[in-house]
Amino acid sequence: AMPKVDAYTKAADRKKTKYKGDVLFVDHHMAHASSFLISPYKKAAILTVDGVGEWTTTAYGVWENRSIKLLKEIHFPHSLGLLYSTITAYLGFSVNNSEYKVMGLSAYGNMDRKTNQYYNRLKEIIDIKEDGSFRFNMDYFVYHYLDKMPSKKLCDLLEGKIRKPDEELTQRHKDIAAAVQLITEEAVTKILNHLHKSTKCDNLVISGGVGLNSVYNGKILRNTHFKGVWLQPD
């Protein structure tokens, strides 16, 4: 993508604006990580989670001494944000716009990991390690090579067709929303506990699309060892 960006800024933008100065490329997740600049912390652990930026879907590290040190990145196609968007599309909502509806809908579903069958089915195709790193069985996803979200194989796993926007929302749909919320919370909690252990920071700044999941954000202080959390305003 970088050569295309460079070509665009040199050709189109410069002709329109007559700008002759330098054009700097800022990494997507490093831009998200800039949330520390408006936080009250001098040192903090940093987590950015979203769909994808360049090739990174999740990145974490530490802000200290006026610099960022990234500790780990997870790359496309393995993405919690794209998983959430896939289920958003499956439930009949618009992608990149209505994920918040799925988050809200999850509260009406079965949030018990032991008894939510759709959580257990999604767990079969998503491997979450103890440090929070994750890998998807891409046989169940098509977003990495097609301009669509739910695959037929995923529909079969969830035992139903993609919901039409005007179709009634059933308890099954609510339980599926709860399942993807549970998966997301589980992965992010493991990442944060590993991040706290690695950085020894008591404060956390979190950003990115998944970082706007307010249902989970309210649980961070309860479920992790962090004592302070700063959320990047949208």
Region annotations inferred by a language model:
Residues 1-234:
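Short acidic/glycine-rich loops and adjacent helix/strand connectors
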